[in-house]
Regions:
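Secretory targeting and sorting signals
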Residues: 1-28
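Short linear S-[DN]-x-LW-Φ motif typified by the pepsin-like aspartic protease active-site region
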Residues: 9, 28-80
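Consensus positions within tandem repeat domains that build extended binding/scaffold surfaces
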Residues: 117, 136, 153, 168, ...
Length: 254
């Protein structure tokens, strides 16, 4: 029998899960802000209250000792005081930031989308956190490390760590080994390739492991869990569950 894997969630991620739940409402259509921390290595995008974002974060290559990242949206973005500019003064929806390092693995890019039914796209390296906030969000974040849906019904793609949050969420993994957590609500989780760890959470969930030696836990609710190929471990949890291992040598726990 395979040893169960226990995944801990850092206090930083738990704090991010609460973003948008306690903030006081502001006026609608406030511009988003892009700010860089004191050492110039970390960038935070904070959406304005009432905005519906269609944000794209795009790498623009590196210069001598710097790398450039572009933020493009359908709504206004306000550049911070240092290292970020609006290249076209007539276009308030585009900001370019320069980070004082040519190393894409150095520094962090944090995306906080807030309320609204937002869309997000990136293949830029160095995106550490994407948080959808409230609203039915679509987060295409293949290069990001941690992707959090937040409240409502979200679609998440990519991320080493994904958390759907509250609502009926759809989480889609890739060929890496990932940690996918559904949260509350009837979620649909597709792990795809890699040795994945899936915790479906509360609700009547549908989980598919894909290829790879996966650990799949249905959690609370009437869940359907299918291991697919690979030597998988399936755990049903409380509720009326349907568990199927698929090809290869699987372990099913009730």
């Amino acid at each position: 029998m395979r040893e169960l894997r226990v995944i801990s969630v850092s206090s930083a991620v738990l704090a991010l899960l609460a973003i948008g739940l306690t903030a006081a409402p502001a006026a609608a259509d406030t511009a988003a802000t892009i700010s860089i921390d004191g050492d110039g290595r970390s960038v935070t995008h904070l959406a304005g209250s009432g905005q519906v974002n269609e944000l794209q974060v795009t790498p623009m290559g590196a210069g001598t000792g710097v790398r450039r990242v572009a933020f493009n949206d359908e709504v206004p973005i306000r550049a911070g005081e240092q290292h970020c500019v609006q290249p076209d003064p007539n276009d308030a929806t585009r900001v370019v930031c320069e980070l004082p390092t040519a190393d894409a693995s150095s520094g962090e890019i944090r995306i906080l989308l807030g309320d609204g039914d937002d869309e997000f796209f990136t293949d830029a390296p160095g995106v550490s956190v994407v948080h959808g906030g409230s609203g039915n969000d679509q987060l295409h974040a293949h290069s990001a490390h941690t992707v959090i849906g937040g409240q409502d019904d979200d679609m998440l793609m990519g991320g080493v760590v994904m958390h759907g949050g509250d609502g009926m969420d759809h989480l889609m993994g890739d060929d890496r080994g990932q940690v996918l957590t559904g949260g509350r609500g009837a979620d649909h989780i597709e792990a795809h390739g890699g040795a994945d760890t899936v915790h479906a959470g509360f609700g009547d969930d549908h989980v598919t492991g894909g290829s790879g030696d996966d650990f799949l836990s249905g959690g609370f609710g009437d869940d359907t869990v299918h291991g697919d190929s690979g030597n998988d471990t399936l755990l049903g949890g409380p509720g009326k569950d349907v568990l199927s291992g698929g090809p290869d040598t699987d372990t099913i726990l009730w």
